[in-house]
Structure formats: C-alpha cells, structure tokens
Amino acid sequence: MHKLHFWLVAFFMVVHCTSIMADDYVQNNDIPYQENGNEYAKERCKLDFYYPTHVKEFPVVVWFHGGGLEGGGKFIPQELKDKGIGVIGVNYRLLPKAGIQECIDDAAAAVAWAFRNVTRYGGSTSKIFVAGHSAGGYLTDMIVLKKDYLQKYGIDADSIAGAFPFSGQVITHFNVRKARGLSSLTPMVDDTAPLYYVRKLPMPFVLLSGDRELELYGRYEEQAYFWRMMQLHQNDQCLLYEMDGYDHGNMPEAGHKIMVRHIKTICDGKKIKR
C-alpha cells in the first residue's frame, strides 16, 4: 500500500513538473509585421513568436523558412525549442506573386519588428540573431550584407548579434536566373546576389552547408568561395561548416546544434570557435 502511495505521488509530481515546463514557453501566432501592402502582403507578412517566460533579456533568433523563394511557410524549428531562446518564424511574400525585392524587403521588415518589439516580451535587442535555411539563408545573407534593406526601417544591420545562413544561395538565386531564361547550372552574380555585397562585418557570421556530395548543385562550393571572400575582408569571425552525411534537406538537424552553441558563446561575450 505504501509503495502504491509513493508511485501515485511520484506520478503527480511528474505531471505537475511537465505542466510547469510547458508554461515556461509561450507562442504567439500570426502577428502582422508589415504596416502597409496589398491583400497578398497582408496574407503572407505574419510571424510566430515562441519565447521563454522564465528568462530575462533572452536572445532571439529570427528564422526564415526555405522553399526556393516560391514555397514554404513559417515554423519554429523543434531543435530550437526549450533552449532559453526566443524564436520568430517568419512568412514572407513569394515568387511569382511578388518580386525578389519584395521577398527581401519582407525579411528586413520582420527583423525590424524584432528590434522594435522583443523587449515587450522580455527579449534583448542586443541579442537578436538572424538565420534561415536555403531561401531563408539567402534572405539572411542579403539583409545582413546590404545595409539598405534594414536602413529603410531605421535599423542598422550591424546591430544584429550574429547571422547563421543554412545552405543559402550566394550567387544570383536560381529562381531569379530562371525568370531571366537561364538554367540552374548557369552561374551569375548581380545585385541580387549576396556575393555582390561581401564586406567587413562586426558580428559573427556562420556559414553552414550539407555534405558537398549530397548538397544541391555546387552549393557547398558557393559557400566555400563566399567564406574565402569574407576572410579577405578580415572577417575572422566568419566560420564555414560542412555537415558530412547530410543533404540539403536535413542539414539543419546538425546545423541547429552548432547555432545554439555559438549563440551561447556570443551572449557570453566570447569569440566563437569551431
């Protein structure tokens, strides 16, 4: 009888603790971040914000989904949950209903929303990180490297605490090239390519790629050249990771762990290392 009583008490303690842990995080969905725009902008320009209620001045990751700039939707990566980090999952307008500049502008507007609003939820504007996978990595590159996009919203891109593009295109995006009648295997670098805007950055910039033999056509090699150009601009806090055995689709599983580790290091005021 005493054993039964003990296990009943233990069971209810576990249930109670699980409930407390669930209450430590809140997720607010479908928050509009663009003040103006047509019906399509009003439909797409929304974000979800997952954040801890038990951490003061928590870091925030603004996360852009992939999908070739023509598909996909906002979500909070499971690997980033329960880490003491706020995560903003962003929807943005897509090709062909929108143009490439509108896609990038939406990404900038979402980051500007973070700078203006995270303190209301307990987050810190000095710990805002930008990241995304594939098309989301491309958007990350563009708004960090070309300062004009965030300047439009009164935000200095150099205020971003760190950037983590996951397998982002750094030459002209393949769907932009496709719209111009070029094949996906015809490389091009113009003013819509992150490579065009390589510069010295004040924040850590971590490039993540899948296995070079499993990635999309030449994607690792793009990252490697991008990394070399960043090094030539004295970006000693620009690191490149290749996820052995991971393809383009599943490489975030490994990449998220690296990102969380580096975010902790940056928030501790230390330099990141491989």
What function would you assign to each model-found segment?
Residues 208, 224, 231-274:
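C-terminal catalytic histidine-bearing segment of alpha/beta-hydrolase fold enzymes
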Residues 73-90:
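Short amphipathic alpha-helix adjacent to the substrate-entry channel of hydrolases
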Residues 57-66:
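Short beta-strand element of the alpha/beta-hydrolase
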Residues 20-55:
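N-terminal cap/lid segment of alpha/beta-hydrolase-fold proteins
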Residues 154-162, 167-176, 184-224, 228, ...:
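The feature captures the conserved acid-bearing segment of alpha/beta-hydrolase catalytic domains
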Residues 98-119, 142:
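Alpha/beta-hydrolase active-site loop
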Residues 115-179, 190:
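Primarily recognizes the serine-hydrolase "nucleophile elbow" in alpha/beta-hydrolase
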